[in-house]
Structures are given as structure tokens and as C-alpha cells.
Amino acid sequence: AMALANKENSGSKKIWGFDSFQGIPMAGEFDDVQVGIGEITHDKFAPLSERLISSGITVHSLESVISNFTNKGLYDSSIRFVKGWFQNTLPEIADQVESISILRLDGDLYESTLVCLEYLYPKVSKGGAVIVDDYLLTGCRVAVEHYFKSIDEPVPEMICVDGNMVHYFIK
């Protein structure tokens, strides 16, 4: 949807897509479910480096995503995909991201959501939208709470989009 809207506006905005393209990593300390699986059966207190492996859920290759964009006539130079775990790619790439109008977070888990907020939220323009796809999952909600506490700001009022998981706020 964002790529289509951007195309209709002459591709004036850069669209960044960060994804592991390996699936969702293993849940951690603040998560109460392993997304897509349910009960957590691994050591969620293990070091992050040991949990940055795919749980096997929601795996789409970068090539298939580019193919889908291309087939719909949406893939152009305004779109940049970054492959890898957020914890590994954001520290290296975030400086290249300029102001953000819409930040959509779909990290599913605490650590994925928190690292995205740490590196990308400061770049969200005043009046920009922040969408948290999985806000009702404990890990995502706690990540939002912890992030805003760390920057000494109140947690923004979250507005539910779909009557379920997806929530957003305006900066």
C-alpha cells in the first residue's frame, strides 16, 4: 500500500523495508508466546545471539518479495530492502534513513520492536505515524513502554486500527 501511494506521488519518498527474510526469531524474556507457534519451549533467557535464529514461522525470501513488487509494477529505485536481523542491520544502516513519515513496526517480539524504536523512532517527523502491528502481544507492548520510559516520555495513546492487534499513534 505504501509503495502504491508513493508511486502515485511520483516516488518522492524513499521506502525502506527491513526484514530478516528468514522468519521470526526465537522469543525472549519479555515475550509470552512464540509467534506463530504458541508455547515457548526454548530458553527465552538465553543470550540474544543464541536466539537470532529462525523459529521457522513466516518465511518469505527477499527474491519473492521483490518479484511480487515487480509484478505489480511497484519496484523501483525509491524502494530499498535490507536483509538481516534488525539487531544486526539497523546499527549499520539507520544513519542512511532520513526523516520518516510512516514507521510500521512488525517485529512480533520485544527485542525486535525495541531495537526498531531505538534506531528509527527518533527519525519520525512530527506529525508522522507510528504503527505497531502486534501491539497486543506482550513483548511488543512492553517494548513500547520500555522505549518511552528510556527517553523520559509518556507512552503515546495507542489507537486500535483493526479491533485487534494493530495500533498506531501520531508523533
Question: What feature does the model see in each segment?
Answer:
Residues A1-K171:
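S-adenosylmethionine/decaboxylated-SAM
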